[in-house]
Amino acid sequence: MAPLDLDKYVEIARLCKYLPENDLKRLCDYVCDLLLEESNVQPVSTPVTVCGDIHGQFYDLCELFRTGGQVPDTNYIFMGDFVDRGYYSLETFTYLLALKAKWPDRITLLRGNHESRQITQVYGFYDECQTKYGNANAWRYCTKVFDMLTVAALIDEQILCVHGGLSPDIKTLDQIRTIERNQEIPHKGAFCDLVWSDPEDVDTWAISPRGAGWLFGAKVTNEFVHINNLKLICRAHQLVHEGYKFMFDEKLVTVWSAPNYCYRCGNIASIMVFKDVNTREPKLFRAVPDSERVIPPRTTTPYFL
């Protein structure tokens, strides 16, 4: 079989186009093989730029790259939730996969709670694949990649990046390293908590209103950071109107990278640039104006009209 034309895939994806089904399958298989080599806690070196949820907002992802620099000039960590809710989940995920395939050491993709079969069948990605390809094969190829995505990244051994937050079942990074990640996200337990939990002003742990994961407080965060010799926990998973938010004596930061979320929230987005572990700079960006994006029709037009 001919080798993958990764340059072509990147170029197609950059134009907000999706690949022919067979090319997408080959790209997904290729990225799965790359992800197989990655640890549950993937080491990453500074300088690096950390990004939060994207949710299928393709044109805003392009704005993110204009703000932070293109791959491979900038080294990126994306903390999950690439798909669902936005108009272009398929094109967004395809673009990130193509970049990962072409420059695997310059972009680290973490799993979010939306990188799941169950969630994508409810929040849009499954239906989008069905509409654009006429079948669910593309969705199946992508969900195989979901299962392979790593769950955390560790910047210079001192900054932990994870989609959601902490778990009462995890005290050390080594306990994250032993999780069996190649599966659908379970309904409860350590793996589930890492992608579903939220920081909150609670004593230790509290039931999460999301119905999965936990709410965790400053005491829990400080203990975890201390035991694991960390400076900071970076996470995404929650809309922040200002783009980012520090909590718990600046031991934790939420980074949100989907501006004007769902095309109506009016929020700013951010990415967090780490020159080194002690030098961080948030970069803010706004949604691309409607004149610069293509708004797809609500439903596909029947062929015979």
UniProtKB/Swiss-Prot annotation:
<feature type="binding site">
    <location>
        <position position="53"/>
    </location>
    <ligand>
        <name>Mn(2+) 1</name>
    </ligand>
</feature>
<keyword id="KW-0131">Cell cycle</keyword>
<feature type="binding site">
    <location>
        <position position="55"/>
    </location>
    <ligand>
        <name>Mn(2+) 1</name>
    </ligand>
</feature>
<protein>
    <recommendedName>
        <fullName>Serine/threonine-protein phosphatase 6 catalytic subunit</fullName>
        <ecNumber>3.1.3.16</ecNumber>
    </recommendedName>
</protein>
<comment type="subunit">
    <text>Protein phosphatase 6 (PP6) holoenzyme is proposed to be a heterotrimeric complex formed by the catalytic subunit, a SAPS domain-containing subunit (PP6R) and an ankyrin repeat-domain containing regulatory subunit (ARS). Interacts with subunits PPP6R1, PPP6R2 and PPP6R3. Interacts with subunit ANKRD28. Interacts with IGBP1. Interacts with MAP3K7. Interacts with NFKBIE. Interacts with TRIM14 and WRNIP1; these interactions positively regulate the RIG-I signaling pathway.</text>
</comment>
<keyword id="KW-0479">Metal-binding</keyword>
<dbReference type="GO" id="GO:0160049">
    <property type="term" value="P:negative regulation of cGAS/STING signaling pathway"/>
</dbReference>
<dbReference type="GO" id="GO:0046872">
    <property type="term" value="F:metal ion binding"/>
</dbReference>
<feature type="active site" description="Proton donor">
    <location>
        <position position="114"/>
    </location>
</feature>
<dbReference type="InterPro" id="IPR047129">
    <property type="entry name" value="PPA2-like"/>
</dbReference>
<dbReference type="GO" id="GO:0005739">
    <property type="term" value="C:mitochondrion"/>
</dbReference>
<keyword id="KW-0904">Protein phosphatase</keyword>
<dbReference type="Pfam" id="PF00149">
    <property type="entry name" value="Metallophos"/>
</dbReference>
<dbReference type="GO" id="GO:0006470">
    <property type="term" value="P:protein dephosphorylation"/>
</dbReference>
<comment type="function">
    <text>Catalytic subunit of protein phosphatase 6 (PP6). PP6 is a component of a signaling pathway regulating cell cycle progression in response to IL2 receptor stimulation. N-terminal domain restricts G1 to S phase progression in cancer cells, in part through control of cyclin D1. During mitosis, regulates spindle positioning. Down-regulates MAP3K7 kinase activation of the IL1 signaling pathway by dephosphorylation of MAP3K7. Also participates in the innate immune defense against viruses by desphosphorylating RIGI, an essential step that triggers RIGI-mediated signaling activation.</text>
</comment>
<dbReference type="InterPro" id="IPR004843">
    <property type="entry name" value="Calcineurin-like_PHP_ApaH"/>
</dbReference>
<keyword id="KW-0496">Mitochondrion</keyword>
<feature type="binding site">
    <location>
        <position position="81"/>
    </location>
    <ligand>
        <name>Mn(2+) 1</name>
    </ligand>
</feature>
<keyword id="KW-0399">Innate immunity</keyword>
<dbReference type="GO" id="GO:0005737">
    <property type="term" value="C:cytoplasm"/>
</dbReference>
<keyword id="KW-0391">Immunity</keyword>
<keyword id="KW-0007">Acetylation</keyword>
<dbReference type="GO" id="GO:0048208">
    <property type="term" value="P:COPII vesicle coating"/>
</dbReference>
<dbReference type="InterPro" id="IPR006186">
    <property type="entry name" value="Ser/Thr-sp_prot-phosphatase"/>
</dbReference>
<keyword id="KW-0963">Cytoplasm</keyword>
<dbReference type="GO" id="GO:0000082">
    <property type="term" value="P:G1/S transition of mitotic cell cycle"/>
</dbReference>
<feature type="binding site">
    <location>
        <position position="237"/>
    </location>
    <ligand>
        <name>Mn(2+) 2</name>
    </ligand>
</feature>
<keyword id="KW-0378">Hydrolase</keyword>
<dbReference type="GO" id="GO:0005829">
    <property type="term" value="C:cytosol"/>
</dbReference>
<feature type="binding site">
    <location>
        <position position="163"/>
    </location>
    <ligand>
        <name>Mn(2+) 2</name>
    </ligand>
</feature>
<comment type="similarity">
    <text>Belongs to the PPP phosphatase family. PP-6 (PP-V) subfamily.</text>
</comment>
<feature type="modified residue" description="N-acetylmethionine">
    <location>
        <position position="1"/>
    </location>
</feature>
<keyword id="KW-0464">Manganese</keyword>
<feature type="binding site">
    <location>
        <position position="81"/>
    </location>
    <ligand>
        <name>Mn(2+) 2</name>
    </ligand>
</feature>
<dbReference type="GO" id="GO:0045087">
    <property type="term" value="P:innate immune response"/>
</dbReference>
<dbReference type="GO" id="GO:0004722">
    <property type="term" value="F:protein serine/threonine phosphatase activity"/>
</dbReference>
<dbReference type="InterPro" id="IPR029052">
    <property type="entry name" value="Metallo-depent_PP-like"/>
</dbReference>
<feature type="binding site">
    <location>
        <position position="113"/>
    </location>
    <ligand>
        <name>Mn(2+) 2</name>
    </ligand>
</feature>
<dbReference type="GO" id="GO:0005654">
    <property type="term" value="C:nucleoplasm"/>
</dbReference>
